[in-house]
């Protein structure tokens, strides 16, 4: 990061009215962290001058009261762990309660690798809080700073009413360093740049930091009719932060078992969404495309019936993703399914099974990150029952986009990770040999996710799905039916 670019506190001092900023941040509880992680946090704090990668609070900008969420890239690359996410959610909810407009100034590489899947899933919590804030009629302004990539750009960084960016800021789904580490080749230059995203209609404008106060003030003046204060801030303390707790080092058996499961989900003969429908659905009516002239076979959309219950099904098709990665159009087709379910009052069933979304320049310029964010936003605000099925591979934002349902089912060998384990290993250890260990540390497996409260039900694989595709599909279908029935049953 260029030394000429302001850090979090410097940006706050530049943008807000003098002496108006009041921090909402509570002291962090680091007692649950292991010694190594605690030392890493201490070094990051000393380097950045902040206690976390996020600062939040209340201030005025040219007389307009506003809530602030500001990222600090010098703190572990601005990465978002559970404490940082809890701080963000607390600030958003407090802003909503107090009727304040919200300005988020991002600077982040995405999910914190030290915390893995439990941290990755907090992008859903943050997005849901943003959706609720916007549903209350309150403005949400986003200022994308250098750099903003990964899960931050693919969630709350892409949900603003107005989205502006710092000049020449690096902004993209997968940062170029991570891309080259994972793929072995550099990402084409000139794509993940603020000015290019403006040219492609993804960002509204490029605004220097020194002009941010003016554009924010003008925007808030126009939107002032929607931002009247509804409560006294003293009556609403900040939302409590959920601390991250380090787990014991995984045993050799745990590492081997999880890695065997991951390899099993990558088998060519593993059944996918088509086998699920063939063996478990009563009837299926396939649908096609976005309805706006786009088609991506990486996602299939259908009306389906399980156990006599009709639903809209959106499923990632592992067969088609072998030759072509899932792009933005696939997620727009998924959102068509979400709209259809809402309009028809039908349950929505999503099936997650992907080695990862398309990482090409075309996908970046087609608003892949924004489509992931909008899928998450739509999933968290559905008015109809929803069930998601983590069927096999669950790599990155493309998987997270369809996961946040009311009930989450996982196959016994399924997994979810912010990056392929080999990619995360390459980033942290400069090799892929540590992938099995890192996958276990990041708690990517179905059983770990169940223990962490991220999955509701596991469908056992005994035998593995590829050894009995019909039986596996029937078991998943029966679980889907049971979960739909439970959601449709009135609670006394």
Regions found by a protein language model. Give the residues of each.
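Intrinsically disordered, low-complexity segments enriched in small/flexible residues
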Residues: 1-61, 65, 213-311, 315-323, ...
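General structural feature for long, well-ordered alpha-helical segments within catalytic domains
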Residues: 8-11, 84-91, 122, 193, ...
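Generic structural "secondary-structure junction" signal
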Residues: 14, 18, 23-26, 30, ...
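Charged, low-complexity, helix/coiled-coil-prone segments
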Residues: 21-42, 62-77, 97-104, 134-144, ...
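Cleft-lining beta-strand/loop regions that shape enzyme active-site pockets
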Residues: 57-134, 141, 302-380, 386-387, ...
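Conserved catalytic cores of soluble enzyme domains
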Residues: 109-229, 352-490
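Short hydrophobic "helix-edge" motifs at membrane interfaces and signal-peptide entry regions
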Residues: 150, 247-248, 343-344
């Amino acid at each position: 990061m260029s030394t000429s670019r302001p850090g979090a506190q410097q940006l706050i001092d530049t943008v807000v009215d003098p002496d108006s900023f009041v921090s909402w941040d509570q002291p962090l509880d680091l007692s649950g962290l292991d010694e190594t992680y605690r030392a890493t946090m201490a070094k990051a704090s000393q380097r950045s001058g902040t206690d976390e990668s996020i600062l939040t609070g209340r201030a005025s900008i040219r007389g307009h009261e506003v809530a602030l969420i500001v990222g600090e890239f010098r703190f572990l690359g601005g990465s978002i762990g559970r404490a940082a996410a809890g701080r963000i959610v607390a600030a958003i909810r407090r802003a909503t309660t107090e009727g304040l407009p919200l300005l988020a100034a991002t600077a982040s590489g995405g999910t914190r690798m030290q915390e893995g899947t439990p941290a990755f899933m907090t992008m859903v919590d943050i997005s849901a809080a943003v959706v609720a804030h916007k549903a209350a009629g309150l403005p949400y302004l986003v200022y994308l700073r250098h750099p903003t990539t990964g899960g931050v750009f693919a969630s709350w960084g892409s949900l603003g009413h107005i989205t502006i960016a710092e000049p020449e800021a690096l902004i993209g789904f997968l940062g170029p360093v991570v891309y080259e580490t994972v793929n072995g080749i550099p990402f084409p230059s000139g794509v993940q740049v603020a000015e290019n995203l403006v040219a492609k209609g993804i960002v509204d404008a490029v605004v220097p930091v020194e002009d941010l106060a003016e554009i924010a003030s003008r925007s808030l003046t126009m939107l002032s009719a929607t931002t009247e204060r509804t409560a006294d801030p003293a009556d609403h303390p900040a939302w409590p932060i959920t601390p991250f707790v380090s787990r014991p080092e995984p045993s050799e058996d745990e590492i081997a078992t999880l890695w065997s499961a991951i390899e099993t989900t990558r088998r060519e003969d593993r059944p996918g969404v088509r086998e699920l429908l063939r063996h478990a659905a009563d009837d299926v009516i396939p649908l096609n495309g976005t309805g706006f002239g786009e088609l991506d076979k990486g996602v299939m959309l259908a009306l389906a019936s399980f156990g006599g219950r009709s639903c809209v099904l959106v499923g990632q098709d592992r067969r088609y993703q072998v030759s072509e990665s899932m792009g933005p159009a696939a997620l727009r087709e998924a959102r068509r399914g979400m709209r259809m379910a809402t309009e028809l009052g039908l349950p929505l069933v999503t099936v997650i099974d992907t080695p990862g979304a398309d990482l090409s320049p075309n996908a970046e310029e087609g608003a892949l990150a924004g489509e992931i964010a909008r899928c998450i936003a739509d999933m968290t605000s559905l008015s109809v029952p929803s069930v998601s099925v983590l069927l096999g591979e669950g790599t990155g934002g493309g998987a997270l986009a369809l996961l946040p349902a009311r009930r989450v089912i996982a196959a016994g060998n399924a997994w979810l990770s912010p990056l392929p384990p080999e990619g995360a290993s390459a980033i942290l250890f400069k090799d892929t040999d540590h992938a099995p260990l890192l996958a276990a540390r990041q708690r990517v497996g179905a059983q770990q996710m169940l223990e962490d409260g991220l999955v509701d039900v596991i469908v056992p694989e005994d035998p593995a799905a590829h050894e009995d595709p019909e039986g596996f599909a029937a078991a998943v279908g029966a679980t889907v039916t049971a979960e739909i029935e439970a959601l449709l049953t009135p609670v006394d």
